[in-house]
């Protein structure tokens, strides 16, 4: 009996060592973060959250703070691109071309937050037309500078990013963006904010107001979150669950 148990132990140890030797490589994720600007609170907290989240995942982050390093070769190593409030300008033509190819041809997935939709003419830069089309043909119009609470309602409850989330939830003190037109006609809207739920109330409204959407015309998996102004969002269990779900969906093979 002792010899049998010893044999079983040696066999299990051997299998464990082989599993370790042939462990799956980590999934590489590029995080383009806007640092030191008005959204620093959100970005800094997001980076800390990603670090903590990675303790139970198999991700390897490449964190960059400008678009200078973005090339087709650089992106080829990364399965997911997270745009943490970095705006769609201050990109070189080479970086733009590489990113467009990455999204158009499904070479990776994309998650964008808030400031990633600052589309228009800013800081002397022309609008990136491709990026505007990517997000539904929109142009930035206004925002709720006073920041207000808003109730977010899920529209596509079957989408994996909403797994184990309630049908609606409140996000506090957000700087809700408005655009020159509704992206709904050119994208698949996943959730909206009820402007009548704003506390305190504000006159800056869109009417039908999408806040999470995806562009199914692109081969890459992609999700845009309109919110993401301040670090306090990470105190919301619904928001952190949503972020985690979106990462997991993005890196999962179709």
State what each model feature region is.
Residues 30-119:
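Helical hinge/lid and interdomain linker segments adjacent to catalytic or ligand-binding clefts
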Residues 143-218:
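Catalytic beta-strand/loop cores that center a nucleophilic Ser/Cys/Thr
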Residues 36-37, 88, 117-118, 167, ...:
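Short, solvent-exposed loop/turn segments at secondary-structure junctions
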Residues 28, 109-111, 188, 221:
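Proline-centered loop/turn at the N-terminus of a beta-strand
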Residues 24-27, 55-56, 65, 76, ...:
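Extracellular ligand-binding/catalytic regions of CAZymes and related secreted enzymes
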Residues 90-164:
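A glycine-rich, often tryptophan-bearing local segment used as a flexible ligand/cofactor-contacting loop or short
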